[in-house]
Amino acid sequence: MTLDTTFAIRPATPADVTHIQSMIVELAVFEKLEHLVVATEEKLHEGLFGPHPACEAIVGEADGEVVTFALFFHNFSTFLTKRGLYLEDLYVRQSHRGKGYGSRMLKHLARLAVERGCGRFEWSVLDWNTPAINFYQSMGAEVMPDWRICRVTGAPLEALAQG
């Protein structure tokens, strides 16, 4: 692993939406979920920078080029009675992997969580993504085997809401 001294992490700006959107598509292709992506630059801009932002993002630049992003938001733990930081997505472009950028992004987010008084920092990982699981565990994360994600979208969500 070689660290590029020109790598810098900063909060995303509206000018970064195009880069983040393209990396979201790259991530979806990698996760074999590209058929689920309906995100547009306009919707992403609204979610990050609209009147009621739903999330935040940071980007990492190498030699002035945006090569990684992390999108995150706050949740709340009833057990801890503290808010948490939830990492929705972290992505490093294929051409820039193995340089330590992912770990630097995670460490940056961990610092944000501590600075904001969060009781935990969480994210999900696909069970087949062994390299990511190993990476996260090497960073001190506990992969929780007893938990499963429950999700309701589309027509089932509408039916549940009517029900």
State the predicted function of each range.
Residues 46-59:
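A short helix-loop-beta-strand connector motif used in the catalytic cores of GNAT acetyltransferases and
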